[in-house]
């Protein structure tokens, strides 16, 4: 293990602050607090490369969770210089942070390629949520932001690479979830997904065309005072003290038209299913 236990932290090491009691923000290596030299995104990438080089002959699982572009908004002067044409300071810093992460990922993939394991390695890339407010990110044309259940808060980039099985550049537009990563990886490794009682779905039959339906007919979200449900292209959002809104994403991806009044029976049906799901989570 190399990293921190929660959230994010400064991207630069400051010895005057590393002895603060917030141990979950310290950088650890296999349980021991360690200093680091350089920009944290670069450090995470280098640690991943060293892991790959140490186990170059063995099957492996690598979970590389960059803190970028989460706040605090820190970037190196060199990377900021690359985006000096962006006049908005927050947007410029955000772009520099994304650039640094992209560079680090590229180096990790180059290392994987150098070891000759690219063809039979599954690589997943995704974000945990949409862009936050006040940090220079832009979710347009989607509505909303991190923390709420409009598409701008929950629809994220989701890429998979497995050259031995799938050609590059293919697009799959079925309803999928980050929960599907484990189920798909388990199946790819020869595990039994059927009896595993997983929330996620093995995507391989859908990606190969053996299954023609959608991996999920329904998906649910809930956090604090926001809840949401997808039923195919229908989406119901609940906000505490506001009520329900209904959207048809097939023709309103931007969620501009609340059509709950026009479809009361659908709203009632989805409300009931959402409440049943929420009761199972308690």
Each predicted region: which residue ranges?
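C-terminal cap/loop subdomain of S1 sulfatases and analogous C-terminal strand-loop tails that border
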Residues: 4-9, 131-151, 166-170, 174-250, ...
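A long, amphipathic alpha-helix that forms part
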Residues: 45-53, 80-121
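Beta-strand elements within well-structured catalytic alpha/beta cores of enzymes
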Residues: 60-65, 98, 105, 122-127, ...
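Active-site rim elements
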Residues: 32-38, 91-95, 165-176, 189-195, ...
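Loop/turn elements at helix/coil->beta-strand transitions in domains of secreted/extracellular proteins
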Residues: 56-62, 117-123, 155, 214-216, ...
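Formylglycine-dependent
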Residues: 1-59, 66-75, 84
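Flexible glycine/proline-enriched surface loops and loop-helix/loop-strand junctions
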Residues: 28-33, 86-90, 125, 139-143, ...
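Histidine-centered active-site microenvironments of extracellular/periplasmic hydrolases
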Residues: 72-77, 110-165, 177
